[in-house]
A protein has these predicted regions:
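Short, Lys/Arg-enriched, Gly/Pro-containing loop segments at transmembrane-helix junctions
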Residues: 141-148, 218-222, 285-300
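Residue-level signature of transmembrane alpha-helical entry/exit and packing/kink sites
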Residues: 116, 164-165, 231, 264-268
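Membrane-embedded transport module
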Residues: 1-27, 41, 46-217
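Small-residue-rich segments of transmembrane alpha-helices in multi-pass membrane proteins
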Residues: 229-237
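Cytoplasmic-side transmembrane-helix entry/capping segments in multi-pass membrane proteins
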Residues: 221-229
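Alpha-helical transmembrane segments of multi-pass membrane proteins
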Residues: 123-127, 200-208, 238-245, 271-279
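Hydrophobic alpha-helical transmembrane segments in multi-pass integral membrane proteins
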Residues: 175-179, 237-253
Length: 305
């Protein structure tokens, strides 16, 4: 619908009517009389050049150039920042969850600890930070402006992402346990097995960084793998950190680990690739269920007829 030459009071009624229908409403204005509508709207947009001080104080956004095209750019940037914040959280929490599950399971089973508290500090303070920061600089996703407005009442982490955090935490814990005890079965020393466990968690994280670049879509394409150079710089830094951690005698003595041979590295990298593919498989299933739920017709109630 188009409303032309409406009075300020009518602007307020339009905003209230659209909000009652469940829409997220943005309203522009520049005069004193526009203040009630700007205040009522979910996003009030005032003019920075011609707007009055009252309208600017009532609005959430001020267009410094009075150019309406700036609204679209601001929405795109805001959605990108919000998505990147979610990606950063989604990469950090499963790592912490996997570490906790590994330690709790080891304590409950009464066996050897695959990782020590000092290893957790290393992972969280060095490698996790280096990887998580890179997602804060992820570029704009191609379809971000085709997505519907986000529900203001929706939580930052929805049920789907909570499930993914739990799912990936379990995969990290299982992979760490499996590699640790497999190395012990092969006759490796406890120090070497723990070095494998620590490197496994780190490279699980590296693989999961790519999964997290797209929260719903597949990352198995050129843009998903190569679309963010900063991610690759972060991975390069993590690889250097882990080489120092694994092979420098001072770090070996400090963290109670031992150097790894080529076969150990192959096992770590192979299981990391498996984790990445398993997460992509989970995302594909989630997309299929989402499409099926959207395609299911909704019955109309008597009040809607």
């Amino acid at each position: 619908d188009i409303f032309a030459r409406v009075a300020p009071a009518q602007k307020l009624k339009i905003v209230q009517s659209l909000q009652r229908q469940g829409h997220v409403v943005a309203m522009t204005g520049d005069g004193v009389n526009d203040a009630p509508a700007l205040k009522q709207a979910d996003i009030g947009v005032a003019m920075g050049i011609t707007g009055t001080d009252v309208s600017k104080e009532s609005a959430e956004m001020v267009l410094l150039d009075d150019n309406f095209a700036s609204i679209e750019r601001a929405i795109e940037e805001g959605r990108t920042v919000f998505n990147n914040l979610k990606k950063t959280i989604v990469i950090i929490l499963p790592t912490n969850g996997g570490e906790c599950l590994t330690l709790v399971a080891a304590l409950l089973l009464g066996g050897l600890l695959p990782i020590l508290p000092l290893h957790i500090l290393w992972i969280n303070l060095v490698t996790t930070v280096a990887l998580a920061i890179t997602l804060a600089f992820d570029p704009v996703e191609q379809d971000i402006m085709r997505q519907p407005p986000r529900d203001p009442q929706a939580p930052l982490i929805d049920r789907g992402l909570v499930w993914r955090i739990v799912y990936v935490s379990g995969l990290i814990s299982l992979g760490t346990f499996g590699l640790f005890f497999y190395e012990l079965e092969l006759g490796s020393s406890l120090e070497a097995a723990r070095a494998v466990a620590v490197n496994a968690i780190v490279f699980f994280e590296v693989a999961y960084v790519f999964n997290s670049r797209y929260l719903n879509d597949s990352v198995l394409n050129r843009r998903g793998i190569l679309g963010n150079r900063i991610v690759w710089w972060g991975i390069a830094a993590v690889v250097i950190f882990q080489v120092v951690f694994t092979y420098w005698p001072v770090m070996n003595s400090l963290f109670h680990v031992a150097p790894l041979d080529a076969w150990m590295w192959l096992r770590v990298l192979g299981v990391s690739l498996m984790l990445m593919l398993l997460v992509e498989f989970e995302k594909a299933i989630a997309r299929r269920f989402a499409l099926r739920s959207q395609a299911t017709p909704r019955l109309r109630t008597n009040s809607e007829v």
